[in-house]
Regions:
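Cytosolic catalytic domains that perform sulfur/thiol-centered chemistry
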Residues: 1-219
């Protein structure tokens, strides 16, 4: 969604979104360690670290896998987020922001949006930022069993089985061409490169932050 729509919602002009929760997503464990959040964020925005939903230790064994359902639920409730909360996310790295959005939807949050263009687009639209740290009010009941959408996740074992035995199943890599070809792992802390056996390339962008291949020449 656009910065203009979000500002309208925050001003009370979007029915049903009067109490929207806005969150900046980044890779720091805590808001005080996040340079971008400290520099200036959307007014009222709380801080959410990717470590609240995924294993972000950088280990090759479990890197970026979802945390357990009970941990994710606990972290959501700590921000006052339930299945009925209207959530808007933004962040400097769209990949991390999208993974948090996915985790929220998997858990059961029914309305999750991402600000198109993030804080840069917000500021370009002429809107103010603030440096005051914000925190949500803890909620007690998420409102549904977590995950509400277990079908949005599959294990490595299930994926391998479907690649081998289900002609209607496609395991699609959306990584860069160099990652697809095994020329690089894409991470400076991981040596292993390549793709799962049987995967097809979805013609991902040049980097995780590049969307040029998905837009018209004029943007």
């Amino acid at each position: 969604m656009t910065p203009e729509w979000l500002k309208s919602a925050m001003d009370g002009n979007q029915k049903g979104y009067e109490d929207v929760v806005v969150a900046e997503v980044a890779y720091s464990d805590d808001a005080k360690d996040c340079e971008s959040y400290q520099k200036g964020h959307i007014p009222g925005a709380i801080y959410v670290g990717d470590v609240e939903v995924e294993d972000a230790t950088g280990s090759e064994e479990g890197a970026y896998n979802l945390l357990s359902a009970d941990v994710i639920e606990k972290n959501l409730l700590s921000h006052g987020i339930t299945k009925d909360t209207k959530v808007v996310l933004y962040g400097g790295d769209i990949s991390g922001t999208a993974r948090v959005a996915y985790a929220y939807i998997w858990a059961g949050v029914e309305d999750v949006k991402i600000v198109n263009g993030g804080i840069d687009a917000w500021e370009k639209a002429g809107y103010e930022t603030e440096t005051k740290a914000n925190e949500g009010t803890e909620a007690k009941d998420f409102g549904t069993t977590v995950p509400a959408h277990p079908e949005y996740w599959t294990s490595i074992e299930d994926a391998k089985d479907k690649v081998a035995n289900d002609d209607n199943f496609k395991l699609v890599s959306i990584r860069s061409e160099e990652e697809w070809l095994g020329k690089t792992s894409g991470y400076n802390y991981m040596d292993k490169a390549g793709e799962p056996d049987g995967a097809v390339w979805g013609k991902g962008a040049k980097t995780a932050a590049d969307v040029a291949d998905f837009t018209n020449d004029d943007g």
